[in-house]
Design a protein with these regions (language model features):
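Conserved G/P- and acidic residue-centered "switch" motifs that form tight phosphate/ATP-binding loops
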Residues: 55, 91-93, 108
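A short beta-loop-alpha structural element at the N-terminal edge
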Residues: 2-14
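Conserved active-site alpha-helix within GNAT-family acetyltransferase domains
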Residues: 106, 110, 115-140
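A conserved beta-turn-beta hairpin within the catalytic core of GNAT-like acetyltransferases
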Residues: 66-78, 88
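Active-site rim helix/loop that mediates acceptor-substrate recognition in acyltransferases
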Residues: 15, 22-67
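Conserved beta-strand segments that form the floor/walls of ligand-binding pockets within enzyme
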Residues: 50, 62, 77, 82, ...
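Conserved acetyl-CoA-binding loop-helix of GNAT-fold acetyltransferases
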Residues: 78, 83, 89-102, 114
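C-terminal "cap" of GNAT-fold acetyltransferases
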Residues: 135-167
């Protein structure tokens, strides 16, 4: 398996992987593929990695800048992340996350946030912090941060407007 940055030739495959990964998971009409498209079109897709297996895109992870208290402070949001359903639970998503976090550090990021299952994301160094909030999280424990160098900032996190897309 190869982990590499997306190219313009990967866009349709990324859309298909994302749709396959999210259809029926939370909704029969997922919007995660539209988030990726919106970030890309706005020039806000800071890091976009694909997992390629035998010449096929089987996974994808996106990272984009977030603001804290209305300011960019060197923090990024992880997501969406998707893996072809037939290949899930085989380490592809974990590899994408690990590689993405390494590359964010190399880019000078101060940390990364995400909304997701703490039982999964804790293994990558993510945890909830009472003073860093995202109002869109279903419960506080589902919004987590992974500081790379400093203490976690305090305040409210806001994702790029592409995250608030609806069908």
């Amino acid at each position: 398996m190869i982990i590499r940055p997306e190219t313009s030739h990967d866009h349709e495959a990324i859309t298909q992987v994302t749709l396959a990964a999210f259809t029926g998971k939370f909704s029969d009409h997922p919007t995660e593929h539209l988030i990726v498209k919106g970030l890309r079109e706005a020039g806000a897709l800071s890091l976009s990695l694909v997992a390629e297996l035998d010449g096929h895109i089987v996974g994808h992870v996106a990272f984009s800048k977030v603001t804290i208290n209305g300011e960019y402070q060197g923090w990024y949001g992880l997501g969406p992340i998707s893996v072809q359903p037939a290949l899930q639970k085989q380490g592809i998503g974990s590899t994408l996350i690990h590689e993405g976090l390494v590359r964010l550090r190399e880019m000078g990021a101060r940390g990364c946030v995400l909304e997701g299952d703490p039982n999964y994301y804790n293994r990558f160094g993510f945890k909830s912090y009472l003073n860093l909030i995202y109002k869109g999280a279903p419960a506080p424990q589902y919004f987590m941060a992974h500081p790379f160098y400093d203490a976690v900032p305090q305040g409210e996190v806001e994702y790029h407007p592409a995250f608030y897309v609806s069908l």
